Amino acid sequence: MLKNETLRRDADAIIRASLNAVLPDEAVRRALKNFRPQGGRVLLVAAGKAAWQMAHAAVKFLGRVDGGVVVTKYGHVKGTIPGVDCCEAGHPVPDENGFAATRKALELVQGLTAEDTVLFLLSGGGSALFEKPLIPGAELQQITGQLLASGADIVEMNTIRKRLSGVKGGRFAQSCAPAQVFSIVLSDILGDPLDMIASGPAVPDTSTCAQALAIAEKYHLQLSAQAKALLAQETPKVLDRVATQITGSVRELCSAAANACRELGYEPVILTDRLCCEAREAGSFLGSIARTHAGQGNKLAFLAGGETVVHLTGTGLGGRNQELALAAAPVIAGLDAAVFSVGSDGTDGPTDAAGGYVDGSTAAALVQNQLKVYDVLQNNDAYHALKAVDGLIITGATGTNVNDVSVVLIGNQG
């Protein structure tokens, strides 16, 4: 079966339209309509993969700020912002540059008065990028690596990370007191739990130390005595003079993707905006939907937003969206159908790809390249397999981060 160029073009168009709809510029401007400074200084702190774009939009809207710090992922700073120190740091594992940038932010908010305002711009990735470790940095990096490899979901990971940090779980807002803190948040966690997005630096924490200890036991985390003691301590449950507004989420991403499908002649159905399971299981399931509905003579689209997980069993290269797509390839073999999945931030795992695309021809192409899907997935090497069959989705850094969207396209040929 020849590669389906029509489905690939449609997939690319849907990706562009959905990502454009959740870019932070307009979202930040919309949220700032509710921004009411107290009359004193206005200081800006932005953390996360979308931090630079959010800060750039905010300063453009406000005209100026009295100082600021941005900390974002390597390669995500796009230029200078007047009055703002723009820093890059490690993600998903925190590094010394992130620690240094966070120290700058904490120094910036020291000695504020009740007349001052901290504009805090937060997006996904902030848990790694915005960090003041309460344990040695090397140990925090090691614990983060354990969590990433364990298959723990983002809520479980952040419940642990809050207690090992001097800024997470509401502690950054405490550092800003008595100033007002106005937070604008791009949500990357299903259901938009404010205290879990980037580990909630400026909102009260709803998780408990009992939950943290249970998670550590569940995943058999190797912890020092100091780290164990911190997990047993509670985080701030009440904060004063803090306001928070969510301005982007996976629901908007799914809605935009569905609208793009409709404009291309597909009948779209949003299955869920809370997809949360093993990536390869999600891929097989979405592939089975294509197998069930193909051949009916209608152009159909099924969409799922959320964030899957990957249990590392090998030493290859890839990401959750690439694994999802690859797992669908054998299920849709021979069909006039495609499955693709993309991360809204433009990066999927430690790769330059945003996600992966497969269609009815991909399984045969993999065989021609002497690649077996099961073996590739066991080695977590979806990147190289998809690259061999032109199945990588490359967008570059988008400047936003509101989870992932996965799409099944079914052509009218069956």
Describe the predicted segments one by one:
Residues G265-S341, P350:
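Active-site segments that bind and position negatively charged phosphate/pyrophosphate groups
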Residues T72-E115, E156, I160-R161:
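Glycine-rich oxoanion-binding loops at beta->alpha junctions
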Residues L326-G414:
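Internal helix-turn-beta structural module
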